[in-house]
Design a protein with these regions (language model features):
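Patatin-like phospholipase
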Residues: 1-43, 51-303
């Protein structure tokens, strides 16, 4: 619809880890309705999906996340020798270069405007990336403390932007957006991160043995527990803490700078690191846009 007007449409893709695959469905559904943003800004996983879209790699990213399994997800995590995080950074970099943007991709060379948000670990200030290497902008924005090592940039240690600006409406406006569509992944998550995942298919042989090994050592990463009365594991506790903090910050930021349109996919059943549940998240992203289309149509026609 922005193709028939002079409005600059901004898309603010919020933080939310595994729930962020819903951004793929949202981008697809908006495009099907003729809504193609001029400006894409993202925080954390929103920065990652947004970068893939702006760099022309959304198809490649979607194909990969739809094929991701529980065991492949677990392979991204290991305690590194310096005890700075649990993410295999070498594997993550290869993934980003293959499915998000090439190492030499620069933000200012893209056809769409792009921005990401990170947090200065020392001062607590938000840092915006609107030019320079795209992968650096993504990496800084997704560096969730405790899981990802902080990234050094211009003398600062940077971590996940969701700590300060979970839905970067302000970045879209600063880049010139007349209308901002915000995506909040944190609206219904507090207290629900322990929801069970769909039942797994039965494995046998080596696959089953390996699955059991992963379950033993990486179980707290996902919803392996059969008993909801068990005390939360390490990553359940991290997930709950992150959910509470981001929900409160999101509410505060959106109250002060609301987007013209706010999309809130229903994703409370997907845990912090359940990256293998992409199909559910993408489908809910599509449904979220479909539910909001009467409001979106009305607003854009009025403007």
């Amino acid at each position: 619809m922005n193709t028939t007007s002079n409005l600059k449409i901004g898309l603010a893709l919020g933080s939310g880890s595994s729930r962020g695959w819903a951004h793929i469905g949202i981008i697809r559904a908006l495009a099907e309705q003729g809504i193609r943003p001029d400006i894409v800004c993202g925080t954390s996983v929103g920065a990652l999906v947004g970068a893939a879209h702006v760099a022309g790699n959304l198809d490649r990213l979607e194909e990969w996340v739809r094929s991701l399994t529980r065991l492949e997800t677990a392979s991204f995590f290991e305690l590194n020798s310096s005890f700075t995080g649990f993410v295999n950074t070498s594997r993550l970099r290869k993934f980003l270069e293959r499915h998000v943007a090439k190492a030499d991709t620069r933000i200012e060379n893209m056809a769409m405007q792009y921005g990401s948000v990170a947090t200065d670990l020392e001062s607590g200030r938000e840092i915006w990336f609107t030019k320079g290497p795209m992968l650096e902008a993504v990496w800084a924005s997704i560096s969730l403390p405790g899981l990802f090592p902080a990234i050094r940039h211009e003398g600062r240690w940077l971590v996940d932007g969701g700590l300060v600006n979970p839905v970067p409406v302000s970045v879209c406006r600063a880049l010139g957006a007349d209308v901002v569509i915000g995506v909040n992944l944190n609206g219904d998550i507090v207290g629900k991160h322990l929801a069970k995942t769909p039942k797994k298919e039965k494995k046998n042989g080596v696959a089953e043995a390996f699955s059991n090994l992963v379950k033993e050592y990486a179980g707290p990463l996902f919803s392996f527990s059969e008993e909801q009365d068990e005390p939360p594991g390490l990553f359940d506790a991290i997930a709950g803490s992150v959910n509470i903090a981001q929900e409160r910050i999101t509410r505060s930021r959106l109250a002060g700078d609301p987007p013209e349109i706010l999309l809130a996919p229903k994703l409370s059943h997907i845990g912090l690191l359940e990256l293998f549940r992409a199909e559910e998240a993408i489908e809910e992203g599509r449904k979220c846009v479909q539910r909001a289309m009467p409001e979106i149509d009305f607003l854009l026609q009025k403007m």
